[in-house]
A protein has these predicted regions:
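N-terminal helix-cap/turn-to-beta initiation motif at the start of protein domains
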Residues: 17-26
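Short polar/acidic secondary-structure junctions
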Residues: 32-34, 112, 127-129, 142-145
Length: 167
């Protein structure tokens, strides 16, 4: 009986250690000024860092390139000229390091619409029925000294995050 309890305890601990971080998954970015959905995102971990790719956009057609971006940015995780990469499928959020559960910082986010790069911090906000009606991701981009803006993204699924194309 002690062996069974011990094994149960070990598996329970292992489950907590290897559980996905709540920021991982599919999200819909919401414009903080208009309240409209702008894009579907996949947020994921790779090599201990956090990344985010656009899966679809509500305003741009499939296959649109990031023509307003520079050819390169510091620490960008994909080789090649960024200005000729597609908006969908490119990791515009990259290099974030884990803080406590649900908090990531120290990376960058590039706005593919204008090519601007910002320091990035992502914080998971669980649904509380008051301020956060659903699970929410606070996506903060800063130029430095705490100057920046936050967007609050809604939890989604892969199908919804992938199907926003206007065409």
């Amino acid at each position: 009986m002690k062996k069974v309890f011990f094994l149960f305890f070990i598996f329970k601990i292992a489950g907590f250690c290897f559980a996905a971080d709540p920021v991982e998954g599919f999200w819909l970015s919401i414009d903080e000024k208009t309240g409209k959905i702008t894009a579907g995102w996949h947020i994921y971990q790779e090599g201990g860092k956090l990344y985010g790719k656009i899966l679809s956009t509500a305003a741009e057609p499939r296959g649109v390139l990031a023509g307003r971006c520079k050819d390169s940015y510091p620490g960008f995780p994909v080789a090649g000229k960024i200005s000729i990469m597609p908006v969908a499928g490119t990791p515009w959020i990259y290099g974030l390091s884990k803080g406590k559960n649900g908090e990531w910082s120290g990376g960058s986010v590039i706005n593919p619409e204008d090519g601007n790069i910002y320091k990035c911090k992502i914080t998971f906000r669980p649904a509380d029925g008051k301020k956060y009606k659903t699970d929410t991701l606070e996506m903060r981009g800063e130029i430095g000294l705490g100057i920046g803006r936050s967007q609050f993204w809604q939890k989604s699924d892969q199908a919804a995050a992938s199907s926003l194309w206007p065409d």
